[in-house]
């Protein structure tokens, strides 16, 4: 399966998984009030995705040892976690998508379907996926926000996830996106797979990401490289 970016989790992913000791919570000031996105024990997925991509951009091999809380690498990953939420727009996008249906909403009028709102399938397949594929075709991995819950509660924002797309295989009936999942470590076999033919309807996003929730949709996040700390 093509990996046009040249990124591989087995060589470019962080050598440790997204499992951390209990530490004081990371709290984000959002349009919905302050949101607790962890205690680090709940995971630093976005920080690990951004960190791996930072190391890849600089051509530096990521450290092989998990940092202890308080060490420069740990503080850097936590800061990149905050960056990955792209305040306030990024948090607002997660929240908006959490409150959208899986398929399009609308009604029948004069024998025609009138769409009142696009669902997550359409937004993922028609809007986000072409941008992600364009990044990959140009050799650049794409950081993804993965929406996993349907909820109007801002407290549930932390149930969403982040991964890094680095390759894909596409046919008219099936798209398989290769992703680096911090929860799965340096595993080259992690994917998200979907049928792009009916984006107006609820679509199954099959996956083997190491999370307990389904994938409802995903979008390209606002990533900008930051030099990682010196080892």
Give the residues covered by each predicted segment:
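Non-catalytic, low-structured ubiquitin/UBL-interacting segments
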Residues: 1
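Short, flexible coil/linker segments at or flanking structured domains
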Residues: 4, 33, 38, 132, ...
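Active-site-adjacent substructure of cysteine-protease-like catalytic cores
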Residues: 121-179
């Amino acid at each position: 399966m093509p990996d046009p970016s040249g990124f591989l989790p087995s060589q470019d992913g962080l050598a440790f998984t997204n499992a951390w000791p209990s530490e004081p919570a990371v709290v984000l000031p959002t349009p919905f009030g302050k949101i607790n996105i962890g205690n680090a024990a709940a995971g630093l997925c976005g920080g690990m995705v951004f960190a791996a991509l930072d190391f890849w951009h600089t051509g530096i091999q990521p450290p092989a040892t998990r940092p202890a809380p308080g060490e420069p690498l740990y503080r850097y990953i936590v800061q990149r976690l905050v960056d990955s939420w792209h305040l306030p727009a990024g948090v607002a996008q997660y929240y908006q998508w959490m409150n959208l249906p899986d398929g399009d909403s609308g009604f029948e009028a004069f024998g025609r379907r009138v769409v009142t709102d696009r669902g997550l399938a359409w937004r993922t397949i028609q809007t986000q996926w072409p941008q992600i594929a364009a990044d990959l075709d140009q050799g650049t991995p794409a950081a993804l926000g993965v929406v996993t819950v349907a909820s109007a509660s801002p407290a549930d924002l932390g149930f969403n996830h982040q991964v890094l797309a680095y390759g894909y295989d596409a046919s008219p009936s099936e798209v398989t996106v290769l992703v680096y999942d911090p929860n799965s470590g340096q595993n080259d076999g992690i994917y998200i797979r979907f049928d792009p033919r009916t984006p107006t309807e609820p679509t199954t996003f099959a996956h083997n990401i190491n999370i307990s929730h389904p994938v409802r949709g995903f979008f390209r996040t606002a990533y900008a490289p930051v030099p990682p700390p010196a080892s």
